[in-house]
């Protein structure tokens, strides 16, 4: 996971940086990361043997760090992870205090790529725009495509490109949020990078993580990526308008999610048909008033 692999060291870009004369992105915000030639040297890796099932399957998450990186001991990975997450969590608490002072509801939308969360978000914003002030932070590795889609609804949005990074972190939110015009008592939606692994570990200062799972992904996704669904308060089972065309067991999916997180709330939803949208909007209003 990225708390130990260092993927957060990629080229970060937040919309507006290109106008800063001191920004490396002033002339080319989407320049690919440099690929310098690297000298490969031999590394004597600490001994680590993955667990093995009777069928021969290998499991690299059984060590004390819960993961594996070549050339790094389990104890060192734990030290790196604790250091990274401690810094992030302190920043997240500052973000949370700022949002709470303005009574803003902040939600961290997480999912696999292609789950439909941007389409669901645009439909949500269209339904809220005359009643609730909203703003959006869009996270992707590259492009401002999704932020442009959000702005087309009339909602303020800012794109955060993580470069090689596979998730948003609390510092990115601290940098991006002040650039958005969001009134007190409004809702800030943070659409995280499409990834069901690393975003689970990084607190952004949100009130809730909302996991979006598409019915095209398979019923057992919560069991395959348990950390994300354990961290989420709500699961939106998306694209249910496609159920007549799929061999997807809704009850099995719900059971898998609740096996990982017995307290998780679940809404069946479709931005295309409108099913579940009222329930989703009611949930948002309940959280705003909580």
From Swiss-Prot:
What results from changing residue 7 to A? Decreases nickel content. Decreases hydrogenase activity of the cell. Disruption of the N-terminal metal-binding site
Q: Which Gene3D superfamilies match?
A: P-loop containing nucleotide triphosphate hydrolases
What Pfam families is this protein classified in? Answer: cobW
Going by the UniProt record, its keywords in alphabetical order are:
GTP-binding, Hydrolase, Metal-binding, Nickel, Nucleotide-binding, Zinc
The regulatory note on its activity is:
Binding of zinc or nickel in the G-domain decreases GTPase activity. Once GTP hydrolysis is triggered, probably via a GTPase activating protein, the GDP-loaded state may enhance HypA-HypB complex formation and reduces the affinity of HypB for nickel, which is then transferred to HypA. In contrast to nickel, zinc reduces the formation of complexes with HypA.
Residues binding Ni(2+) 2 are 166-167, 198
Please list where the region (G-domain) is annotated. 106-267
For this record, the Gene Ontology CC terms, alphabetical, are: GTPase complex
The GO terms describing molecular function are:
GTP binding; GTPase activity; guanosine tetraphosphate binding; metallochaperone activity; nickel cation binding; protein homodimerization activity; zinc ion binding
Give the residues the record marks as binding Zn(2+).
166-167, 198
An example GO BP is: protein maturation
Per UniProt, Ni(2+) 1 binds at: 2, 5, 7
Q: Which CDD domains match?
A: HypB
Subunit structure, as described in the record: Monomer. Can form homodimers, but dimerization does not have a critical role in the hydrogenase maturation pathway. Forms complexes with HypA and SlyD.
Show the domain comment. Answer: The N-terminal region contains a high-affinity nickel-binding site and the C-terminal G-domain contains a low-affinity metal-binding site, which is not selective for nickel and could possibly accommodate other divalent metals. Both metal sites are critical for the maturation of the hydrogenases.
Function of the protein: Involved in the maturation of [NiFe] hydrogenases. Required for nickel insertion into the metal center of the hydrogenase. Exhibits a low intrinsic GTPase activity, which is essential for nickel insertion. In the presence of GDP, nickel, but not zinc, is transferred from the HypB GTPase domain (G-domain) to HypA.
Specify the protein name.
Hydrogenase maturation factor HypB
């Amino acid at each position: 996971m990225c708390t130990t692999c260092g993927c957060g060291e990629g080229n970060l870009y937040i919309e507006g940086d290109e106008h800063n004369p001191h920004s490396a992105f002033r002339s080319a915000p989407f320049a690919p990361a440099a690929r310098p030639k690297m000298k490969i040297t031999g590394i004597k890796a600490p001994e680590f043997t993955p667990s093995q099932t009777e069928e021969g399957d290998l499991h690299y998450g059984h060590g004390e760090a819960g993961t594996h990186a070549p050339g790094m001991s389990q104890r060192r990975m734990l030290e790196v992870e604790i250091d990274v997450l401690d810094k992030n969590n302190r920043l997240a608490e500052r973000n949370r205090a700022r949002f709470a002072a303005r009574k803003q509801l902040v939600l961290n939308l997480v999912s696999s790529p292609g789950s439909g969360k941007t389409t669901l978000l645009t439909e949500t914003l269209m339904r809220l725009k005359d009643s609730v002030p909203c703003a959006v932070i869009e996270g992707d590795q590259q492009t401002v495509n999704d932020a442009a889609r959000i702005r087309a609804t009339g909602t303020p949005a800012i794109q955060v490109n993580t470069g090689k990074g596979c998730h948003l972190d609390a510092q990115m939110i601290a940098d991006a949020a002040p650039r958005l015009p969001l009134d007190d008592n409004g809702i800030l939606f943070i659409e995280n990078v499409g990834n069901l692994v690393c975003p689970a570990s990084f607190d952004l200062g949100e009130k809730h993580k909302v996991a979006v799972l598409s019915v095209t992904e398979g019923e057992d996704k919560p069991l395959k990526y348990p950390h994300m669904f354990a961290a989420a308060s709500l699961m939106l089972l998306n694209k249910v308008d496609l159920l007549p065309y799929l061999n997807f067991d809704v009850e099995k999916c719900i059971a898998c999610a609740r096996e990982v997180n017995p307290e998780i709330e679940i809404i069946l939803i479709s931005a295309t048909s409108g099913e579940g949208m009222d329930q989703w909007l009611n949930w948002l209003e309940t959280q705003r008033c909580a």
